[in-house]
């Protein structure tokens, strides 16, 4: 375990099991329907890469880069779109893939934007969910694990762009982010 972590919430094995189970459900839900998977950069990259390997249907991928943190541990509520999709999603089945759903402010903004583009359907898959933090009226259809309200890093999740490369997810020690 990394020295800056207080504990490990999800091991590599836990994460792979979540991807396998979620991938099977998504495969069943979208069988015989092409799917556009939209990863939210940067955090979702590792989860998306592992999840889409487990989805057995025709799919394409695209990415959006959106920020509401601006370097801290709390969402500012102000959503900035840094990179938009590269292709049209009109009349397509779209699955947003996110690393973590907390306040929901960011995902609510993204879903409203994508729905305005006349998609056929739009759902959310998230590895982690913190329902106690929810401020926006939004839920993910596919949830890997509900977790307590602690600041987590690893497997794509960061604190000031660090810890994304950890192959597991852990809780960051308070003294690390309170400096």
Swiss-Prot record:
<comment type="function">
    <text>Purine salvage pathway enzyme that catalyzes the transfer of the ribosyl-5-phosphate group from 5-phospho-alpha-D-ribose 1-diphosphate (PRPP) to the N9 position of the 6-oxopurines hypoxanthine and guanine to form the corresponding ribonucleotides IMP (inosine 5'-monophosphate) and GMP (guanosine 5'-monophosphate), with the release of PPi.</text>
</comment>
<keyword id="KW-0479">Metal-binding</keyword>
<dbReference type="InterPro" id="IPR005904">
    <property type="entry name" value="Hxn_phspho_trans"/>
</dbReference>
<keyword id="KW-0808">Transferase</keyword>
<feature type="binding site">
    <location>
        <position position="158"/>
    </location>
    <ligand>
        <name>GMP</name>
    </ligand>
</feature>
<comment type="pathway">
    <text>Purine metabolism; IMP biosynthesis via salvage pathway; IMP from hypoxanthine: step 1/1.</text>
</comment>
<dbReference type="GO" id="GO:0046100">
    <property type="term" value="P:hypoxanthine metabolic process"/>
</dbReference>
<keyword id="KW-0963">Cytoplasm</keyword>
<dbReference type="GO" id="GO:0004422">
    <property type="term" value="F:hypoxanthine phosphoribosyltransferase activity"/>
</dbReference>
<feature type="binding site">
    <location>
        <position position="98"/>
    </location>
    <ligand>
        <name>Mg(2+)</name>
    </ligand>
</feature>
<protein>
    <recommendedName>
        <fullName>Hypoxanthine-guanine phosphoribosyltransferase</fullName>
        <ecNumber>2.4.2.8</ecNumber>
    </recommendedName>
</protein>
<feature type="binding site">
    <location>
        <position position="42"/>
    </location>
    <ligand>
        <name>diphosphate</name>
    </ligand>
</feature>
<dbReference type="InterPro" id="IPR029057">
    <property type="entry name" value="PRTase-like"/>
</dbReference>
<keyword id="KW-0460">Magnesium</keyword>
<feature type="active site" description="Proton acceptor">
    <location>
        <position position="102"/>
    </location>
</feature>
<dbReference type="GO" id="GO:0000287">
    <property type="term" value="F:magnesium ion binding"/>
</dbReference>
<comment type="pathway">
    <text>Purine metabolism; GMP biosynthesis via salvage pathway; GMP from guanine: step 1/1.</text>
</comment>
<dbReference type="GO" id="GO:0000166">
    <property type="term" value="F:nucleotide binding"/>
</dbReference>
<dbReference type="GO" id="GO:0006178">
    <property type="term" value="P:guanine salvage"/>
</dbReference>
<dbReference type="InterPro" id="IPR000836">
    <property type="entry name" value="PRibTrfase_dom"/>
</dbReference>
<keyword id="KW-0660">Purine salvage</keyword>
<keyword id="KW-0547">Nucleotide-binding</keyword>
<feature type="binding site">
    <location>
        <position position="43"/>
    </location>
    <ligand>
        <name>diphosphate</name>
    </ligand>
</feature>
<dbReference type="GO" id="GO:0005829">
    <property type="term" value="C:cytosol"/>
</dbReference>
<keyword id="KW-0328">Glycosyltransferase</keyword>
<dbReference type="GO" id="GO:0052657">
    <property type="term" value="F:guanine phosphoribosyltransferase activity"/>
</dbReference>
<dbReference type="GO" id="GO:0032263">
    <property type="term" value="P:GMP salvage"/>
</dbReference>
<feature type="binding site">
    <location>
        <begin position="151"/>
        <end position="152"/>
    </location>
    <ligand>
        <name>GMP</name>
    </ligand>
</feature>
<dbReference type="GO" id="GO:0006166">
    <property type="term" value="P:purine ribonucleoside salvage"/>
</dbReference>
<dbReference type="Pfam" id="PF00156">
    <property type="entry name" value="Pribosyltran"/>
</dbReference>
<feature type="binding site">
    <location>
        <position position="164"/>
    </location>
    <ligand>
        <name>diphosphate</name>
    </ligand>
</feature>
<dbReference type="InterPro" id="IPR050408">
    <property type="entry name" value="HGPRT"/>
</dbReference>
<feature type="binding site">
    <location>
        <position position="99"/>
    </location>
    <ligand>
        <name>Mg(2+)</name>
    </ligand>
</feature>
<feature type="binding site">
    <location>
        <position position="130"/>
    </location>
    <ligand>
        <name>GMP</name>
    </ligand>
</feature>
<comment type="similarity">
    <text>Belongs to the purine/pyrimidine phosphoribosyltransferase family.</text>
</comment>
<dbReference type="GO" id="GO:0032264">
    <property type="term" value="P:IMP salvage"/>
</dbReference>
């Amino acid at each position: 375990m990394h020295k800056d972590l207080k504990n490990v919430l999800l091991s590599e094995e836990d994460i792979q099991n979540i991807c396998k189970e979620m991938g099977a459900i998504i495969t069943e839900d979208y069988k015989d329907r092409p799917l556009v998977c939209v990863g939210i950069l940067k955090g979702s990259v590792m989860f998306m890469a592992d999840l889409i390997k487990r989805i057995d249907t025709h799919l394409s991928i695209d990415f959006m880069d959106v920020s509401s943190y601006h370097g801290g541990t709390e969402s500012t509520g102000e959503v900035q779109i840094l990179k938009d999709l590269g292709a049209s999603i009109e009349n397509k089945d779209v699955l947003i893939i996110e690393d973590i759903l907390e306040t929901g402010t960011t995902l609510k903004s993204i879903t409203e934007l994508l729905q305005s583009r006349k998609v056929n359907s739009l759902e959310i898959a998230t590895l982690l969910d913190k329902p106690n933090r929810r401020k926006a009226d939004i839920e993910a259809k596919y949830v890997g694990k509900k977790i307590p309200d602690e600041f987590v890093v690893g497997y794509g999740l960061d604190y000031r762009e660090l810890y994304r490369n950890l192959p597991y997810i852990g809780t960051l020690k308070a003294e690390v982010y309170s400096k």
